[in-house]
Every structure is written in C-alpha cells, then in structure tokens.
Amino acid sequence: MEVNIDLWCDDTSLLDDVGRYRRLVGKLIYLTVTRPDITFAVGVLSRFMHKPREVNWTAALKILAYIKSCPGKGLLYKKHGHTHISIFSDAGYTGDIGDRKSTSGFCTFIGGNLVTWRSKKQDVVSRSSAEAEYRAMTHIVCEMA
C-alpha cells in the first residue's frame, strides 16, 4: 500500500459490487496466515467492508500486485539449536486519521521462528506515544498470560 494514501477520502465513488471487494479482502485475510508482511495493510482495508470506495479497491489490487511481485516471502520454519522465546511490540501513535486511535502490534518468536503476530487498533485514543506503547505492552502481557 502506498504511504500517505487517503483511504478515508469521500471524493471517490462507492463500489458498485461490494461483494467483490468483501470476497477479495476475505481472501487476503486468509492469506495473512502465511504472509505476515501484508497483515497491517489488509487490516486497514478490512475497516471499509461496509462502504468500500474505488480508492479501497485500488489499494487491495496493489496488495495483490505486491504478493505477485515477491512470491517467496511466506513463513519458513528452520530448526535452531535453541527454543528461546522473544516477544516484540510496537504502537503507531494516532495511526488512524479517521478517529486518531493508535494501532498496536506484537510478534512472538520461538527458536528464531515467527509463531504468532497481531496488529489491532486500540480501543481508546492515547494522549501520548508513551501511553500508546504502554497499552501495546499491556496487551501483550495479557495475551501471553
């Protein structure tokens, strides 16, 4: 997906075939099981399932073009001599220009292999980037407990 594209733009027309958009985004969601590199972009597009516009359809097609351009980017699990668990988190402060809510995410590695990941829009608006990061870290602790 392009940087700084306005997916919330009301200038473009609504799609005639909403079902086609929903089917494509649904298939992309299924594909995120093995392609974590598209998870965030697909998550953003899934926010427009109720009223997709032409700009959303174009962004979905660009994700398909990206997938086609780099076919070997899926998950590959390798045997390492250890089973250390590493967890990383991050939060994008006020990432959603529609409602200014932050997006937090995390990924878990066991033995150097990615096993879980998640990206989610936070439920409340954070007042600072530190608060958004703290919420992301708290979410991970609750998820792993």
Predicted regions and their residues:
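Divalent metal-binding acidic/histidine catalytic loops
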Residues: 1-145
